[in-house]
């Protein structure tokens, strides 16, 4: 395959800012945990529990709202930019609805859920109050999603990158103020991290609004001059967003189930598993960023009916992530002990975590194929079939095989890393087949 350097540069220019914005978000979460841990173990535990309960709700809602990106990208490709404000406006309405539902869930279920976890009273209290702050943060985080889709597709991904980079130090300063009680703020410990997150997302939404309203290409006046939304836009959000959201929930819930089976192997195994899993999550930001870039670039070309260019960007995206995989896999295998030692000094944890990272290397390879293809398919507005393919890979291949490796073959805790490799590998193969079918279909049509 010959490489068009101008298209490769455009891909990199779209992907790198997304990656930097992702790193900024991870940095905010990192500061929440580390600063809370400097107050007390109870504060760290409360924040960790609250964040764990919040994550599946957060990622599922984000999966639903990401439908705005391929919708807007295809409209840009069709030269129907004037239709984009209604897409974004509907996304804002959907964000408000999701925020109301989350607040209702919190009000009805938080006490029952925390009681079921049998936590120490101090930890339970911190987790409850931390999540109350996250109810407010959730509203503004969800409102930021459609606004980001607008700036990413109509403008450039460098805009959201700059805004997230501005939000990162603000989050750090707010954490310092509200966790430790500095500059006249109350010392709230771990709960202060939730307040800081809320205020940071308020700041971020204000930044997005300032950019959109002050730059004519973003059609800020058209976006807010009318409350109009139409049923067909809601239907398209549901058609694209629900499979995305269910796919994200399915994946996060799978890892939640796996940790339940890992716990029987003891504290050191749990620590090793979490360390390796955390590292793999950091590495996953690379293919995930490429996936998001693919949705924008492929969606634009599909909207313009330039299917040959959509196919070219698809190949360039896969080439980019596989090149990155060669580097990250090599580094993971060569420095696996050093990587785990960043998380723990316990020799048993380092030994077992290093073994898990060998499986993580295989996982990285398959993720660097599967994630970009998911983004490509979203660019084609193909969401329902990929969801069912992921359902097969994760819940009909991955999870049962983990139980088989553990309870029948007695592979121990390695069973669940082996099954992840098998599941992600299966998803990569199935998604390759789906992409091949979609590309042939649009060419025939």
Regions found by a protein language model. Give the residues of each.
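Short alpha-helical transmembrane segments in multi-pass integral membrane proteins
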Residues: 1-15, 72-137, 185-242, 298-363, ...
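N-terminal transmembrane alpha-helices
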Residues: 2-34, 38-39, 52-71, 96-103, ...
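Transmembrane helical elements of multi-pass membrane transporters/channels
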Residues: 13-32, 133, 137, 167, ...
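Transmembrane alpha-helix boundary and packing residues in multipass membrane permease domains
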Residues: 18, 22, 33-34, 51, ...
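Helix-terminus/linker motif at the lipid-water interface of multi-pass membrane proteins
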Residues: 23, 27-45, 114-121, 177-188, ...
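Alpha-helical membrane-inserting segments
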Residues: 24, 28, 32, 36, ...
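Small-residue-rich hydrophobic transmembrane alpha-helices
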Residues: 44-107, 141-160, 259, 272-336, ...
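Short runs within selected transmembrane alpha-helices of multi-pass transporters and secretion channels
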Residues: 65, 134-152, 160-171, 193-209, ...
């Amino acid at each position: 395959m010959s490489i068009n350097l101008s298209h490769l540069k455009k891909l990199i220019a779209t992907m790198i800012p997304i990656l930097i914005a992702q790193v900024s978000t991870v940095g905010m979460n990192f500061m929440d945990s580390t600063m809370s841990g400097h107050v007390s173990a109870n504060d760290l535990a409360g924040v960790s529990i609250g964040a764990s309960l919040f994550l599946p709700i957060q990622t599922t809602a984000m999966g639903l709202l990401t439908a705005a990106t391929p919708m807007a990208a295809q409209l840009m490709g069709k030269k129907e930019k004037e239709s984009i404000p209604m897409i974004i406006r509907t996304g804002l309405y959907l964000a408000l609805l999701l925020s109301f539902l989350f607040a209702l869930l919190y009000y009805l279920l938080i006490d029952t859920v925390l009681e079921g976890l049998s936590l120490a009273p101090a930890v339970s209290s911190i987790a409850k109050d931390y999540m109350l702050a996250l109810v407010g943060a959730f509203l503004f985080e969800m409102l930021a999603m459609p606004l980001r889709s607008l700036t990413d597709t109509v403008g450039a991904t460098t805009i959201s990158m700059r805004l997230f980079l501005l939000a990162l130090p603000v989050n750090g300063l707010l954490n310092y103020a509200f966790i430790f009680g500095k500059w006249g703020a109350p010392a709230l410990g771990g709960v202060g991290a939730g307040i800081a997150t809320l205020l940071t997302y308020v700041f971020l939404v204000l930044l997005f609004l300032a950019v959109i309203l002050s730059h004519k290409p973003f059609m800020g006046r058209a976006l807010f001059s009318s409350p109009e939304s139409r049923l067909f836009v809601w239907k398209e959000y549901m058609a694209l967003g629900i499979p995305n959201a269910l796919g994200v929930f399915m994946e996060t819930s799978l890892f939640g189930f796996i940790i339940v089976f890992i716990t029987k192997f003891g504290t050191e195994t749990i620590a090793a598993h979490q360390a390796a899993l955390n590292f793999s999550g950091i590495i996953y930001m690379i293919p995930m960023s490429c996936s998001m870039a693919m949705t924008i670039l492929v969606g634009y070309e599909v909207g313009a009916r330039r299917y040959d260019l959509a196919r070219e960007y698809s190949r360039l995206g896969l080439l980019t992530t596989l090149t990155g995989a060669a580097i990250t896999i090599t580094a993971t295998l060569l420095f696996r002990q050093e990587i785990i030692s960043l998380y723990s000094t316990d020799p048993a944890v380092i030994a077992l975590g290093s073994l898990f990272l060998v499986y993580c290397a295989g996982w990285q390879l398959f993720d660097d194929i599967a994630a970009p293809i998911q983004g490509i398919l979203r660019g084609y507005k193909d969401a329902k079939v990929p969801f069912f393919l992921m359902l097969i890979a994760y819940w009909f291949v991955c999870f049962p095989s983990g139980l088989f490796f553990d309870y029948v073959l007695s592979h121990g805790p390695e069973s669940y890393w082996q099954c992840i490799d098998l599941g992600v590998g299966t998803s990569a193969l199935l998604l390759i087949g789906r992409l091949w079918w979609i590309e042939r279909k649009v060419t025939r049509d």
